[in-house]
Amino acid sequence: MRWAAPFRKVNAYGIPAPTLCAKLVFDYCLRMPKTILFILALITVSATAAFAAPQTMRLDYYHTGTASQELFSVDRVVIEPLPWPGDMTKAIDYTNLGKYFFEVRDQKTKQVLYSRGFASIYGEWETTDEAKAMSRTFSESLRFPAPTAPVEIVLRKRDAKNFWVEIWTTVIDPKDMFVDRSKQSASARLIPIQKMGDPATKVDFLIIGDGYTARELKKFEADARRLTQVLFKTSPFKEHRRDFNVWGLCPAAGESGISRPSTGIYRDSPVGTTYDAFGSERYVLTFDNHALRRVAQHAPYEFIEVLANNRTYGGGGIFNLYSTVAADNGFANYVFVHEFGHHFAGLADEYYTSPVAYAAAAERTEPWEPNATALLDPQALKWKDLVKPDTPLPTPWNKAVYERDSRAYQKRRGQLRADKRPESEMEALFREVQTHEDAMFRAEKYFGRVGAFEGAMYEAKGYYRPEVDCIMFSRTDHFCAVCRRAIERIIGLYSH
């Protein structure tokens, strides 16, 4: 293996020598007197600490195309300022999540050194009507532990049947003179919101503020701490709080707030977040990947949340890219957790009555997302082990009544936006709907039980969700059992 020197020697399971040594010593010490155990523990800790983490390498590239074709080109290769924050014993991703998947392979031996699944803005954009009429280019990045010898970057994408197809390969030589090793100054002070341990053994979650002026930096920190508390009051994050480090970065903005083009508001914010992504007034994204990476590289991170300093309802979340939320909205708590579910665990949207920019799927294939199914074979349902024997598949619920009420609600919501009514009126409508839906779902025969409830992934028919209610479906405050398990699986991939 060709990572930095301390990680070259591994066992057959891919465990680096220091970690393997520590495990063997620990197993042996269980049989030793306490004094000897204590001495050997000190030696083990000291020896393990002597091995430094590799550097963090980032491949910035351009992703160009239309709904039917796509091209890739290298932008630059960067060595980020901080060491690799991840666990080198968990370099390989076996979760099979994401629309895309990349591998870092030793060019000589073809051994896979690192891999991760992910989704992208391009992957969403190519399903919109705009992608049928024109081409666009998006900046994207892949981050991985810096190798010491040439590697191949292999990128795969799911085809229409959800099989992986190789779509791009490029070679990186870490000794190339054009690898950018410049030391860039941080644009913001790193705030340790919650530090539970070494980044290599924890999930590292970075919260970035956008649209906060220099006078509002204390507000950012208060917002970040408030929403962090919300996340860790929600299961299963609550039970795994000690597995997370949380960091904050907030470069000062020249003006307060972020862009909202549909209302004529434009801001040159540090990270470039904006409402109206893909023409959806509530969808908040940044298309400026360079700006995001310039800020983020000064913190140890695997996951990013961008807090937009705005009141208007909105947010977004893309698996293994980032999530966003309008920090001042009355439903920021819900949006923060919901969108982080997308970003962190690849959870699908389970709702289907709200308007979206994406075109409907031409055929029903089994989704890669862990909380949605096409139910092509009920006996092979991916969460079948959580279904009680007396729960029918598909699982009945008052779908027609829900859809009738939801149509009326969406009409009222659209009128509030069209009339440019105050955000407080929209929040009042959301509270009214939340109260109504909560009572309706709790009255369901199969409430709180895992089954297969039709209606998910923006489609009324053909896709099914695990429970009648979940934070990925409505504005409730909890994840369903299937989503909780999916989240815990990702926590395990990044912590120990």
Please tell me what each predicted stretch does.
Residues L37-A47:
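Bacterial N-terminal signal peptides
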Residues M177-S235, G248-I258:
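Fold-level signature of zinc-dependent metallopeptidase catalytic domains
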Residues F340-V356:
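Catalytic Zn2+-binding segment of zinc metalloproteases
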